[in-house]
A protein has these predicted regions:
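N-terminal nicking endonuclease/strand-transfer module with a His-rich metal-binding environment
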Residues: 1-231
Length: 231
C-alpha cells in the first residue's frame, strides 16, 4: 500500500513496491506510549509476523496479521482536507482499539481508466493491541466477537467525519452510511463490482454483475426522476 521496498525477516525476502504510483500520503498512527521503533513500517510488520511464529519459525497457518479498512473520500475534499480527515479517523481507531494503524491515501489511476474522483485510503490495523510496555500484546477480540457491531460503528463514525468535513469545506453534499432500506428509501443498492469487473468495464466488456448494476442504476434514476416530478 505504501509503495516502499520492504524486507521480510521471516522468509528473508524483499518485497519491492517502489514502482507503484499514486500514493498521496502515508502515516503510521499508534498509542502515545508505543515503542518508537514500531513507527518504522518495515520494523512494525516484521514484529507483527514475529508475534505469529510457531516454535519452528514458521508463521501459524491460522495467523491473521492485519485487518483492513478501505475508505473513499468525498470528491469535494482537497488533499489537505483528505489528510486531516484520515488523521481524525485513524486517531479514533487507535484510541478505541489500542492498535497501530498504517494508513495510505491513494490517488486514482486515471491513465488506466480509473475515475478521477476515486481518492481512497487503505488502513491496515494490527490484530494485537499495544501493551503497557509499548510493544505488541494480546489479540484484539472485538472484531471477532462483535464484528457486525464494530463495522456499523465505524461506518457511522466515517459518515459523521465526512459530513463534518464537507460542511467545513462549504459543500452542501452529505453522506449516509445506512442502507437504503434503513433510510426508508425505495432506491435499490448496487453490488460491489471489485477490480476484475471494473477492469472489464473499462474494456467495454459486460459481466453479469455490471449488467445487474446498470439495471439497478437505471431503475433508481427513474424513481428519482419521478420524485422530482411529484414535487
Amino acid at each position: 500500500r505504501s509503495a516502499e521496498k520492504l524486507i521480510c525477516n521471516t522468509y528473508g525476502k524483499e518485497q519491492d513496491y517502489t514502482q507503484k504510483t499514486g500514493v498521496e500520503f502515508k502515516k503510521i498512527y499508534a498509542p502515545s506510549h508505543t515503542d518508537k521503533h514500531l513507527s518504522d513500517r518495515q520494523t512494525l510488520w516484521n514484529e507483527v509476523e514475529k508475534s505469529e511464529l510457531k516454535k519452528n519459525g514458521e508463521i501459524k497457518a491460522t495467523a491473521q496479521l492485519a485487518r483492513e479498512f478501505e475508505i473513499a473520500f468525498p470528491q469535494e475534499l482537497n488533499q489537505a482536507q483528505r489528510q486531516k480527515m484520515l488523521d481524525e479517523l485513524c486517531q479514533k481507531i487507535v484510541e478505541r482499539h489500542g492498535v497501530i494503524a498504517d494508513a495510505c491515501i491513494h490517488a486514482p489511476h486515471t491513465a488506466s481508466g480509473s475515475d478521477e474522483r476515486n481518492y481512497h485510503a487503505h488502513i491496515l490495523l494490527t490484530t494485537r493491541s499495544i501493551n503497557e510496555r509499548g510493544t505488541l500484546g494480546k489479540k484484539t477480540r472485538e472484531f471477532n466477537d462483535q464484528g457486525k457491531q464494530q463495522v456499523e460503528h465505524w461506518r457511522a463514525q466515517f459518515a459523521e467525519l465526512c459530513n463534518r468535513h464537507l460542511e467545513q469545506a462549504g459543500s452542501l453534499e452529505r453522506v449516509d452510511h445506512r442502507s437504503y432500506k434503513a433510510q426508508g428509501s425505495e432506491l435499490e443498492a448496487t453490488q460491489h463490482e471489485g477490480s476484475k469487473v471494473t477492469q472489464l468495464r473499462r474494456q467495454g466488456i459486460d459481466t453479469e454483475i455490471s449488467l445487474k448494476n446498470d439495471a439497478v442504476k437505471a431503475r433508481n434514476a427513474e424513481k428519482l426522476a419521478s420524485e422530482q416530478l411529484i414535487k
